[in-house]
């Protein structure tokens, strides 16, 4: 997915800003946090974060959850380069492994309702003829 932040700001400007941040804030990493397109989760109020190097991915997810006021029954997932980073990993480790060439770490978040409110399955929409070739007695 293309980053809206990248679309709005030229590479040179992003790189200069990330370099300035790295020089000024040695104990923080610059992170751009954006919602996955077409996700059914609220939009975050700000995209740019200076994240402490000792913050875990799980703690950062908590920050995102609070900023978007996500109800407890909704799940949230974050992705870095299409990878779901381990919850216990430090942001600094993820940054070193996945930072963009402009110096920012790009984090995408998405959500789906996985707790409590499951939609009923409409059995009338299933093509039962596909199951006629199964010989369950052999198994």
UniProtKB/Swiss-Prot annotation:
Q: Which family does it belong to?
A: Belongs to the ATG8 family.
What Gene Ontology terms describe where this protein resides (cellular component)? Answer: autophagosome membrane; cytoplasmic vesicle
What membrane topology is given?
Lipid-anchor
What protein name does the entry list?
Answer: Autophagy-related protein 8
Q: Can the keyword Ribosomal protein be found in this entry's annotation?
A: no
- Protein role: Ubiquitin-like modifier involved in autophagosome formation. With ATG4, mediates the delivery of the autophagosomes to the vacuole via the microtubule cytoskeleton. Required for selective autophagic degradation of the nucleus (nucleophagy) as well as for mitophagy which contributes to regulate mitochondrial quantity and quality by eliminating the mitochondria to a basal level to fulfill cellular energy requirements and preventing excess ROS production. Participates also in membrane fusion events that take place in the early secretory pathway.
Q: What is its main location?
A: membrane
Q: Where is the lipid attached (Phosphatidylethanolamine amidated glycine)?
A: 116
In its record, the post-translational modification comment is:
The C-terminal 23 residues are removed by ATG4 to expose Gly-116 at the C-terminus. The c-terminal Gly is then amidated with phosphatidylethanolamine by an activating system similar to that for ubiquitin.
Which residues make up the pro-peptide? 117-139
Species this protein is from: Scheffersomyces stipitis (strain ATCC 58785 / CBS 6054 / NBRC 10063 / NRRL Y-11545)
Listed under GO biological process in this entry are: autophagy; protein transport
Identify the InterPro entries for this entry: Atg8-like (IPR004241), Ubiquitin-like_domsf (IPR029071)
User: Quick check: keyword Aminoacyl-tRNA synthetase in the entry?
Assistant: no
Q: Which domain of life is it from?
A: Eukaryota
């Amino acid at each position: 997915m293309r980053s809206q932040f990248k679309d709005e700001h030229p590479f040179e400007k992003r790189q200069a800003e990330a370099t300035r941040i790295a020089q000024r804030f040695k104990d923080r990493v610059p992170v751009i946090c954006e919602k996955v397109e077409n996700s059914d989760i609220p939009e975050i109020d700000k995209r740019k974060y200076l994240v402490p190097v000792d913050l875990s991915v799980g703690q950062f997810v908590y920050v995102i959850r609070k900023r978007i006021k996500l109800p407890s029954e909704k799940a949230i997932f974050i992705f870095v380069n299409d990878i779901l980073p381990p919850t216990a990993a430090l942001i600094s480790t993820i940054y070193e492994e996945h930072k963009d060439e402009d110096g920012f770490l790009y984090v995408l978040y998405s959500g789906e309702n996985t707790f409590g409110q499951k939609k009923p399955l409409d059995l009338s929409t299933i093509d039962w003829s596909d199951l006629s070739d199964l010989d369950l007695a052999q198994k």
